[in-house]
């Protein structure tokens, strides 16, 4: 529950041993976050459909309502980078990573949470989804036939969100706003209220951000 690795077997057969403190599990915390308080049950209404028991191609193609796009094998790059509060410097660094990923043959490049705007002073650095920095990412994606997913602090309708944008050759494809907020997020951001996935020419792409991944319901 504290995020530490208790034991590892990374290859071959074996038995993993570790001493565990059961009191940690009784705290109902993960990485010092009270996860049970941060659940969003109203967002999990689709879970009883049990789609995980189906072959995805059969489930999503049922009655032709929401068929999956034709899939393909693609090279995806996940970037790890440190961001500052200087958006221009962050954007320059992002383009440097994009150039490397493009040259390696990547078709989708994923940047971290808040990569574009930084982790400090989110309200002051927040941008709208049609500001020049987002448009520059979309223009790069269009010119290089590339899909880009990038986190940023978003200002929308007088609210602030921890968001991620997906851009591609088509332009700005969509925005996902983080649904599960941790303590840091709650100090500045509003909760998102919709899961987002997007059909692209490389397949269906669903978005989550950081703390979302702690919750199996996501």
Residue ranges, per PLM feature:
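Active-site catalytic loop in hydrolytic enzyme cores
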Residues: 1, 31-34, 127, 155-218
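CN hydrolase (nitrilase-like) catalytic-core segments centered on the catalytic cysteine
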Residues: 1-16, 130-149, 213-218
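C-terminal beta-strand edge segments of enzyme domains
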Residues: 1-72, 197
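Alpha-helical scaffolding within the catalytic cores
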Residues: 57-64, 133, 193-194, 213-216
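Short beta-strand segments enriched in small/hydrophobic residues
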Residues: 67-84, 88
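Active-site metal-binding loops of divalent metal-dependent hydrolases
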Residues: 81, 114, 212-213
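Cys-nucleophile CN-hydrolase/nitrilase-fold catalytic domain and related Cys-dependent amidase chemistry
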Residues: 87, 96-177, 184
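Short, acidic/polar
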Residues: 89-100, 213-218
């Amino acid at each position: 529950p504290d995020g530490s690795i208790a034991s590892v077997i990374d290859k071959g057969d074996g038995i993993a041993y570790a001493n565990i403190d059961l009191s940690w599990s009784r705290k109902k915390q993960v990485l010092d976050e009270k996860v049970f308080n941060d659940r969003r049950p109203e967002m999990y209404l689709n879970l009883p459909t049990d789609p995980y028991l189906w072959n995805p191609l059969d489930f999503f193609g049922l009655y032709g309502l929401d068929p999956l796009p034709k899939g393909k094998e693609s090279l995806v790059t996940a970037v790890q980078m440190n961001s500052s509060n200087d958006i221009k410097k962050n954007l320059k660094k992002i383009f440097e990573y994009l150039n490397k990923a493009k040259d390696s043959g990547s078709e989708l490049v994923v940047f971290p949470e808040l990569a574009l705007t930084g982790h400090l002073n989110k309200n002051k650095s927040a941008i709208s989804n049609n500001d020049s920095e987002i448009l520059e990412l979309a223009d790069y994606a269009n010119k290089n036939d590339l899909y880009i997913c990038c986190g940023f602090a978003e200002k929308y309708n007088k609210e602030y969100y921890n968001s991620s944008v997906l851009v591609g050759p088509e332009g700005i494809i969509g925005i996902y706003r983080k649904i599960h907020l941790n303590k840091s997020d709650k100090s500045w951001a509003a909760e998102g209220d919709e899961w987002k996935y997007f059909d692209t020419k490389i397949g269906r792409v669903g978005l989550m951000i950081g703390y979302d991944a702690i919750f199996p319901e996501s």
